[in-house]
A protein has these predicted regions:
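Flexible, acidic/Gly-rich N-terminal and inter-domain linker regions that tether
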Residues: 1-104
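Conserved Radical SAM active-site core
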Residues: 92-95, 101-174
Length: 174
């Protein structure tokens, strides 16, 4: 991420609308940005071609989309694919795509490490390193190869979702 720039990914429609109006842009620009972020899955503000060049330049001076590609993916013979994402805390989190006959599930993370230290889970053994932002949670869904075919998203990756309820609930609402 470019230093000093705020991230757009993870913001709600209301937050995007408030942001653009504070910059002197029309309210409908918030909806356009939301469509670019969450429907068209762009990686840069320059790709938002129905925004004027002046508005794209103004946004790009202060903001970045915030999408990041997985740093690694590993495919198993049953079709399950594990993705590894770098996050702002400097840690790494996993997302796992699980194909089935009539379903395509993505298991996503909500924290780097975990405080719970459950006996059956290795994540707790790593210790807790931080909560993911709503944007980092959403990025996992938008950035996997299979994202267009997903039928289910489950918060059963790294971390305890209810220990990061604010960002988890925001990621669901977006």
């Amino acid at each position: 991420m470019p230093e000093g720039k705020e991230i757009l990914l993870g913001r709600t429609l209301d937050e995007l609308t408030e942001l653009v109006t504070s910059l002197g842009m029309p309210r409908f620009t918030g909806k356009q940005i939301a469509q670019w972020l969450y429907d068209k899955r762009v990686s840069s503000i320059d790709e938002m071609t129905n925004l004027s060049k002046a508005n794209r330049t103004l946004l790009a001076e202060r903001y970045t989309v915030g999408r990041t590609a997985p740093v690694m993916s590993q495919l198993s013979k049953d079709g399950t694919r594990k993705y590894l994402f770098a996050v702002s805390t400097g840690g790494l989190v996993e997302a796992v795509f699980i194909p089935d006959k009539d379903r395509a599930t993505l298991c996503i993370s909500s924290q780097v490490g975990c405080k719970m230290d459950c006996l059956f889970c290795m994540t707790g053994k790593q210790g807790f390193k931080g909560n993911l932002s709503s944007g980092e949670i959403i990025n996992q869904v938008l950035s996997v190869e299979e994202s267009a075919s997903l039928t289910n998203v489950v918060y059963m990756g790294m971390g305890e979702p209810l220990d990061n309820a604010t960002n988890v609930l925001k990621s669901i609402s977006v």
